[in-house]
Amino acid sequence: MRLVTMLVVAGLAGLLASTPVLAADAPPEVALTIEKNRFSPDEVRVKAGAPFVLVIANKDAGAEEFESKDLRVEKVIPGGKTVRLRMPALKAGTYTFVGEYHEKTAQGRIVAE
């Protein structure tokens, strides 16, 4: 009987250890879409001091490069694909970004407040 109890307890402990992190613990997601060589929305607001995930969906056929010198981030997003960028907690302020392949039209900013 003791062996069965120990095995059940060990099994439950293993199950709990392998349980994924709850969604409430995950950083918030901020969606951006690339379409017709533009970002939409062209301004997003995030909470200053809190990390977040930038989810960028490229609806165009061609690739676009998300680039922010302010954030020191560069990421190519293939046409028809979505990428997720984990962003660190930002100080309050405005951070600009562009689509490097279409800098005249693909522009935006992240406002941390």
Task: Give the positions of each predicted feature.
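Extracellular/periplasmic metallocenter environments
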Residues: P28, P78-E113
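Sec/Tat signal peptide C-region and signal peptidase I cleavage site
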Residues: T19-A23
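Short beta-strand/loop motifs in extracellular/secreted proteins, especially
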Residues: F52, G62-E64, A106
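N-terminal edge beta-strand
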Residues: A26-G49
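Beta-strand-rich interaction surfaces with strong enrichment in secreted/lumenal proteins
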Residues: D42-V44, R72-V76
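Asparagine-centered strand-capping/turn motif at beta-strand->loop junctions
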Residues: I56-N58
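Bacterial N-terminal signal peptides
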Residues: M6-A17
